């Protein structure tokens, strides 16, 4: 059975897709070229949207990326208003998403612990 999505979930997903396309194709600022939009959260009145992103260039470039995104936010909001039919086009607030890096860090810690455990068990067997 297909999953039911609320209107706000559909709007959030459409906003994420449209912003990703606009950033990729329309924003000429090189500071925002290598980002991926990971999530969008929208306020109940649609007045504000938190847009979460990750960067292929790493966390050290986040301040520059945020500066570029903030500079382009008026353009992005205007274009979003033309593409997404909602009563209020949200004000965009960009946030760096650390969850991907945190997930990688935790995965490495788990791998290290498993490796150490295997070595310890190998030594115990000998």
UniProtKB/Swiss-Prot annotation:
Q: Where is this protein chiefly located?
A: cytoplasm
**What's any one GO cellular component for it?**
cytosol
Q: Which GO terms describe its molecular function?
A: ribosomal small subunit binding
Keyword Protein biosynthesis carried by entry: no
- Protein localization: Cytoplasm
UniProt keywords (A-Z) are: Cytoplasm, Ribosome biogenesis
Question: Which InterPro entries does the entry link to?
Answer: KH_dom-like_a/b, RbfA, RbfA_dom_sf
GO BP field: maturation of SSU-rRNA
State the Pfam families in the record: RBFA
Q: Which PANTHER family match?
A: RIBOSOME-BINDING FACTOR A, CHLOROPLASTIC-RELATED (PTHR33515:SF1)
The record's similarity note reads: Belongs to the RbfA family.
Q: Which HAMAP family match?
A: RbfA (MF_00003)
- Quaternary structure and interacting proteins, as annotated: Monomer. Binds 30S ribosomal subunits, but not 50S ribosomal subunits or 70S ribosomes.
Its biological purpose:
One of several proteins that assist in the late maturation steps of the functional core of the 30S ribosomal subunit. Associates with free 30S ribosomal subunits (but not with 30S subunits that are part of 70S ribosomes or polysomes). Required for efficient processing of 16S rRNA. May interact with the 5'-terminal helix region of 16S rRNA.
Q: What is this protein called?
A: Ribosome-binding factor A
């Amino acid at each position: 059975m297909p999953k039911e999505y609320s209107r706000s979930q559909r709007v959030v997903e459409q906003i994420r897709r449209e912003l990703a396309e606009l950033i990729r194709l329309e924003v000429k600022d090189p500071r925002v070229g290598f980002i991926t939009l990971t999530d969008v959260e929208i306020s109940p009145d649609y007045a504000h949207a938190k847009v979460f992103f990750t960067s292929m260039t790493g966390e050290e470039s986040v301040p520059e990326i945020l500066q570029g995104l903030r500079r382009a936010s008026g353009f992005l909001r205007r274009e979003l208003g033309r593409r997404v039919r909602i009563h209020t086009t949200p004000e965009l607030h960009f946030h760096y998403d650390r969850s991907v890096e945190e997930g990688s860090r935790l995965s490495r810690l788990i791998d290290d612990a498993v490796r150490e455990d295997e070595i310890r068990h190998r030594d115990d067997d000998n």
